[in-house]
Amino acid sequence: MANSKSAKKRATQAERRRQHNASRRSMMRTYMKKTIAAIEAGDKEAATAALATATPLLDRMATKGLIHKNKAARHKARFTAAIKAL
């Protein structure tokens, strides 16, 4: 448990950030799942539309530091390749 005033403040800030990041991470995963579902269904138009909404979101999460930029690039590349293969 934090003893000093500054440590207590940092603990509350960390908890606030953790909850905010969890919400963002959940949103990102939801959009990724929508893209995956469209790809598995074989619907190229829906998959392309889902990827168009997921791509800027992945880029934003990478910019904010929620995920690594290489992870965002890897997901985008794999989704794009899967859609082209449909």
From Swiss-Prot:
This protein's UniProt keywords: Ribonucleoprotein, Ribosomal protein, RNA-binding, rRNA-binding
Q: Please list the disulfide bridges.
A: none
**UniProt cross-references to InterPro entries, sorted A to Z:** Ribosomal_bS20, Ribosomal_bS20_sf
Give the GO cellular component terms, alphabetically.
cytosol; small ribosomal subunit
Bias kind Basic residues: ranges: 1-27
GO MF terms, alphabetically ordered: small ribosomal subunit rRNA binding; structural constituent of ribosome
Disordered: annotated segments: 1-28
Q: Which domain of life is it from?
A: Bacteria
Q: Which Pfam families match?
A: Ribosomal_S20p
**Coiled coil residues, start to end:** none
Query: Its GO biological process terms?
Result: translation
Can you tell me which family this protein belongs to? Belongs to the bacterial ribosomal protein bS20 family.
What does the UniProt function comment say about this protein? Answer: Binds directly to 16S ribosomal RNA.
Q: Which HAMAP family match?
A: Ribosomal_bS20
Q: What is this protein called?
A: Small ribosomal subunit protein bS20
High-level lineage: Bacteria, Pseudomonadati, Pseudomonadota, Gammaproteobacteria, Vibrionales
